Regions:
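Domain-level signature for soluble enzymes in the chorismate/prephenate branch of the shikimate pathway
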Residues: 1-241
Length: 241
């Protein structure tokens, strides 16, 4: 039997899913790789993998894209790991440096700045350029909030803007996946989520970041109807950028 190739994100927010997959009978049926979000998306788009936990902004670029899990990386309001960090208040932001690791967060920043904050901003991607603000996501944001005079949590700002939760990444396939596998996969993800407290014991303690609050409360992993609505709305805003 051909193994199903899966690319998942290497960040802490995905560890419950990985835990569930690694403690399930699926291990014999899959090839699992851990990547940064942009690489998860690239592998799925290029057909190097069958399923990926991909930044949602990449979904329109995936051939035959279909969401195969009832779980996602999401939040209802503040998420505490997807930020616009700024030297100036948002009304004064003129230049923003984007994050090379995620298309979704860059697009979310653009959508919020244009439609929510009504700011005309120019975007740069090069490290050396000194911008007013930067987009930063994932583990690289842990404990960084105090390094900047202004921090805008994009999950919180999206909620302020739309009244909806947000989906940062979803489990997407680029082909039809057998329903039996999908059922087992969802069970594995649910099991991993149920073991978050145990998982925390194995994670390194961070002085300046509350991992327990992050994994148990800030992140919201169920792909609800409201999150699906938010996803469709977000993709429609990206199309208007």
């Amino acid at each position: 039997l051909n193994k199903i190739k899966i690319s998942a994100v290497s960040y802490t927010n995905t560890k419950p899913f990985i835990y569930g997959i690694e403690h399930s009978a699926l291990l014999d049926q899959i090839d699992l790789s851990l990547d940064i979000p942009t690489d998860c998306a690239a592998k799925l788009i290029d057909g190097q993998v069958d399923i990926g936990l991909i930044p949602v902004a990449a979904i329109p670029h995936v051939p035959n894209a279909n969401i195969v899990a009832d779980y996602c990386i999401g939040s209802v309001g503040a998420v505490n790991s997807v930020f616009i960090f700024s030297k100036v208040p948002v009304a004064e932001i003129k230049t923003v440096r984007l994050d090379s690791q995620s298309r979704t967060s860059n697009n979310l920043a653009k959508v919020l700045l244009k439609f929510h904050f009504k700011q005309a901003v120019s975007y740069v991607t090069d490290e050396p350029i000194d911008a007013d603000a930067i987009v930063l996501i994932g583990d690289r944001t842990f404990g960084r909030r105090d390094d900047f005079p202004f921090a805008y949590d994009m999950g919180e700002e999206w909620m302020n803007f739309t009244g909806l939760p947000f989906v940062y990444a979803a489990w997407v396939a680029n082909k039809a996946i057998p329903q039996g596998f999908i059922n087992d996969f969802n069970q594995a993800l649910a099991f991993g989520l149920s073991k978050r407290k145990e998982l925390l014991l194995d994670l390194p303690k961070l002085d300046n970041f509350d991992l327990e609050d992050y994994l148990l409360h800030k992140l919201d992993f169920e792909l609800t109807d409201k999150k699906r609505e938010a996803l469709a709305l977000f993709l429609s805003y990206i199309a208007k950028l």
